[in-house]
Structure formats: structure tokens, C-alpha cells
């Protein structure tokens, strides 16, 4: 039983590699056969599979009853019904430039930091100016 699943997995990987290259499945679908019979393990669905896969090709696996979908590029899901979303940053036009305007909150924080630094520098300047004006006799230690 595990050999059948291994063959199915191998066939799915081959089909997926052909799908990524953009080739049509009718021309690239490998014919995987069992040693005892000449019936392909994976084949395209017949007329019963028309419309089963919304954005892809219907595949029937001999060992597992049921139909499965091989989704086209950009789609995912059991029946290829979901669109794969691309990153917004990569989908933008590269020729456009984006300018960022800082919010008023950020501007207030920056102005506050500048005011605090200015106040600290002024207090240090005033303190050193006062100590420099002291007479020399006040600085002598008894």
C-alpha cells in the first residue's frame, strides 16, 4: 500500500515541476504504469471532470478514488478556487516614488525632544557661567 502512495507522490512532484515550467499538462503528463497492468496511475479526468477544477486541470489517480486538481499558476485550494495573493510592495509600479509625510504625533515628539535638549544645555551653560563668576577667595578651601 505504501508503494502506491510513493508512486502517487512521485507523479505529483513530476506534474508540479512541469506546471511550474508553464507547459501544458496534455503534452507533459508522464505515463506512470503499474508493473502488472498498462493502465496509467495518473491520468486526466474525462468528461466527468469538466468544470470540477475552477482554475486548473482535473487529474484522476487510479489508486485513490476521486478527482484531484492541478492548479494553474496563481491559484490554490482543493478545487483551485483561491487566488494566491502577491505582496503589495512587489506589485507596485517600480517607476513611481512614494513620499512619506510624518504624522503630527511624530512631529510633536521630535519638537519635545529638541525643547528638552535645549533646556538642558541652557541650564548647564548658566550653571558654569555662575561658577566662573565666583571670586577667587570663595574657592579657597580652609
Swiss-Prot record:
Q: What intrachain disulfides are recorded?
A: 45-58, 53-69, 71-80
**Gene Ontology biological process terms, A to Z:** epidermal growth factor receptor signaling pathway; positive regulation of cell population proliferation; positive regulation of mitotic nuclear division
Q: Which UniProt keywords apply?
A: Disulfide bond, Early protein, EGF-like domain, Glycoprotein, Growth factor, Host membrane, Host-virus interaction, Membrane, Secreted, Signal, Transmembrane, Transmembrane helix
The record ties this protein, via InterPro entries, to: EGF-like_dom, GF_C11R
- Tell me what turns on expression of this protein: Expressed in the early phase of the viral replicative cycle.
Segments crossing the lipid bilayer: 101-121
- Signal peptide residues on this chain, from the entry's feature table: 1-18
Query: Per its UniProt entry, which superkingdom is the organism in?
Result: Viruses
All residue ranges annotated as the EGF-like domain in the record: 41-81
* Single GO MF descriptor: epidermal growth factor receptor binding
Q: Where, in residue ranges, is this chain on the Cytoplasmic side?
A: 122-142
| Any one GO cellular component localisation term in the record | membrane
Q: Where is this site: Cleavage (By host protease)?
A: 96-97
For the Extracellular compartment, the record's topological domain ranges are 19-100
- Known glycosylation sites: 34, 95
Listed under subunit, the entry gives: Vaccinia growth factor interacts with host EGFR and promotes EGFR dimerization.
Protein's job: Stimulates cellular proliferation (hyperplasia)and mobility around infected cells to promote rapid and efficient spread of infection. This effect is beneficial for virus replication in vivo, because poxviruses replicate possibly better in proliferating cells than in quiescent cells. Acts by binding host EGFR, inducing its dimerization, autophosphorylation and leading to activation of several cellular pathways regulating cell proliferation or cell survival.
Record's family? Belongs to the orthopoxvirus OPG019 family.
The protein here is known as: Pro-vaccinia growth factor
Amino acid at each position: 500500500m505504501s508503494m502506491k502512495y510513493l508512486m502517487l507522490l512521485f507523479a505529483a512532484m513530476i506534474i508540479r515541476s512541469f506546471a511550474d515550467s508553464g507547459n501544458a499538462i496534455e503534452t507533459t503528463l508522464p505515463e506512470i504504469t503499474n508493473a502488472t497492468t498498462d493502465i496509467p496511475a495518473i491520468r486526466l479526468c474525462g468528461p466527468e471532470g469538466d468544470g470540477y477544477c475552477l482554475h486548473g486541470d482535473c487529474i484522476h489517480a487510479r489508486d485513490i478514488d476521486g478527482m484531484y486538481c492541478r492548479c494553474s499558476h496563481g491559484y490554490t485550494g482543493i478545487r483551485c478556487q483561491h487566488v494566491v495573493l502577491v505582496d503589495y510592495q512587489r506589485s507596485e509600479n517600480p517607476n513611481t516614488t512614494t513620499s512619506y509625510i510624518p504624522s503630527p504625533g511624530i512631529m510633536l515628539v521630535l519638537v519635545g525632544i529638541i525643547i528638552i535638549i535645549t533646556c538642558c544645555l541652557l541650564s548647564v551653560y548658566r550653571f558654569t557661567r555662575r561658577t566662573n563668576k565666583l571670586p577667587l577667595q570663595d574657592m579657597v578651601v580652609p
